[in-house]
Amino acid sequence: LTWEDLPLDAIRDAFIFWISVTGLSKEPSRSAHHAALGTRDRRRFTIADLDYRPMFWKDKETAHREVSRILPKVTVAIGNREECEVAIGERDPERAADALLEAGVELAIVKQGLEGTLAKTRTERVEMPVTSVETKNGLGAGDAFGGAICHGLLSGWSLEKTIFAASTAGAIVSSRLECST
């Protein structure tokens, strides 16, 4: 897939647009991501999932460099502590959220596993404890979390309600053996 294959009008006009930074790890996907983000031009709800998968990257430094280049082009960034460390050099949730905001995002969401989730804007801070469940399989929990974030943003929910829904959605999926029910 190259940037020439992208439906740029649809990308520009979408109410929400989500990328995974794994797509920045190699060409031609990297250029396609940059073309899409350039087309979005920081429109509301342009989301970067800081999804760091080491097997796709040459090294952490390359991942850091590439992710740093896109942060000013997105309005929302979501990642766990390790992903934030790779993206912006901060593992501490509070400092990571602040660094993401300083990099240009409007909403920074730091997932902390069993310690819950921290979400920050320039004017609001929400700390949500984990929704307690017996974990059977974590596969798909992040997807459910992200889907609930998108739903909350598009529905105009408060940040607190959005993060609560995301935490709960992720917990429900992790409490099941299979991730599709």
What are these regions (language model features)?
Residues L1-V126:
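Ribokinase/PfkB-type carbohydrate-kinase core domain
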